[in-house]
Amino acid sequence: EQQKYLNAKKYVKLFLVADYIMYLKYGRNLTAVRTRMYDIVNVITPIYHRMNIHVALVGLEIWSNTDKIIVQSSADVTLDLFAKWRATDLLSRKSHDNAQLLTGINFNGPTAGLGYLGGICNTMYSAGIVQDHSKIHDLVAIAIAHEMGHNLGMDHDKDTCTCGTRPCIMAGVLSCEASFLFSDCSQKDHQEFLIKNMPQCILKKPLKTDVVSPAVCGNYFVEVGEECDCGSPRTCRDPCCDAATCKLRQGAQCAEGLCCDQCRFKGAGTECRAAKDECDMADVCTGRSTECTDRFQRNGQPCKNNNGYCYNGKCPIMADQCIALFGPGATVSQDACFQFNREGNHYGYCRKEQNTKIACEPQDVKCGRLYCFPNSPENKNPCNIYYSPNDEDKGMVLPGTKCADGKACSNGQCVDVT
């Protein structure tokens, strides 16, 4: 499972914000600020490509009227304010994995940027801030790649770390010379972070239409107007793709995808993905495209020895959810614990309507907060919950979970399985 996760291609859907001082600095010229941001992304993309990560710019916002937070020279205060704004305002408007603020302000001391360590995919902490500290956009791009590196679990390099050139991207001190490589330590940090946390948001590939920056032929990502993209003509090894034009070579039907083989579509009915479990189905090619469309068993089909019902290709049961939250020995609490969900307080509720927590009706108590018994020597409390004010949804019973015979959770209610 871990190896499969590590091998999977990762995608960071990036949102960039430029503050009001940036807008003034570039002569109140929106096009100039945008071009600066696009140039920066075009430097970041190949840096992360070497780490099996594609960085796609899915959003860009320029604060051309006034700042939406109080940007100040204290970097840690500004980072906290930016992260809170992202969590409470930006995320509800535009889905993305990571946000970085580019500011024209001078931070105190030698700081050129700041980012939360290991924050990727977290509602509250997948963010960084960077000072537009140099006219050379390569150096600013490397500073953003550095803060994103922190978000992706990389710490500062120690003296023993190397990337063949000195310094590397995660060096603790900003360098005047551009370095486009991560050190051996950074790669190890990142790998260990991925294995430990398995962040899910970066597995989702963005749509071509999600990308807001102009298409760049040679960045390994097929964008609007391209048929394929295998990198530069110098590095491309794909016989199906013309690297200079990002168009398919003559006679080729496709260049990549689970239903593409030697530049041709695989035949209709060819299996392209085996069934993962009893709620999944084997996926097959259509013979007309490279897509391997995900199919699964109908919702409501019994699974896991009748302990659950299939829901969107998975079999969510409370026992597994308790193990995921509290460790391998955890079990589901007794029914009496679930009565706390009738209180409608800050953690015990069934759903939220316009940010108001709605208490569970008696028949719905098993569709609110999940109660578990950790079964560990240090915790003998029979009614435990997982609750984090930064991510209140984590620790709720998952949609589709069996809550009674013939019933499953939907929007905080225990309803008939149809």
UniProtKB/Swiss-Prot annotation:
The active site is at E147. It holds the Pfam family Reprolysin. Binds 1 zinc ion per subunit. Gene3D superfamilies: Collagenase (Catalytic Domain), Disintegrin domain. Keywords: Apoptosis, Calcium, Cell adhesion impairing toxin, Disulfide bond, Fibrinogenolytic toxin, Glycoprotein, Hemorrhagic toxin, Hemostasis impairing toxin, Hydrolase, Metal-binding, Metalloprotease, Protease, Secreted, Toxin, Zinc. Zn(2+) binds at H146, H150, H156. Belongs to the venom metalloproteinase (M12B) family. P-III subfamily. P-IIIc sub-subfamily. Its cofactor is Zn(2+). Glycans are attached at N29. Snake venom zinc metalloprotease that induces apoptosis in vascular endothelial cells (VEC), without degrading the extracellular matrix (it cannot cleave collagen) or inhibiting adhesion of VEC. Has also fibrinogenolytic and hemorrhagic activities. GO terms for cellular component: extracellular region; plasma membrane. Its main location: secreted. Expressed by the venom gland. It is found in: Secreted. Homodimer; disulfide-linked. Ca(2+) 1 binds at V216, N219, F221, E223, E226, D229. Its EC number is 3.4.24.-. This is Zinc metalloproteinase-disintegrin-like crotastatin. A motif (D/ECD-tripeptide) lies at residues 278-280. Residues 214-299 form the Disintegrin domain. GO terms for biological process: apoptotic process; proteolysis. Residues 10-206 form the Peptidase M12B domain. It comes from Crotalus durissus cascavella (Northeastern Brazilian rattlesnake). Ca(2+) 2 binds at D280, M281, D283, D294, R295. Disulfide bonds join C121-C201, C161-C185, C163-C168, C217-C246, C228-C241, C230-C236, C240-C263, C254-C260, C259-C285, C272-C292, C279-C310, C303-C315, C322-C372, C337-C383, C350-C360, C367-C409, C403-C414. One of its GO terms (molecular function) is metalloendopeptidase activity.
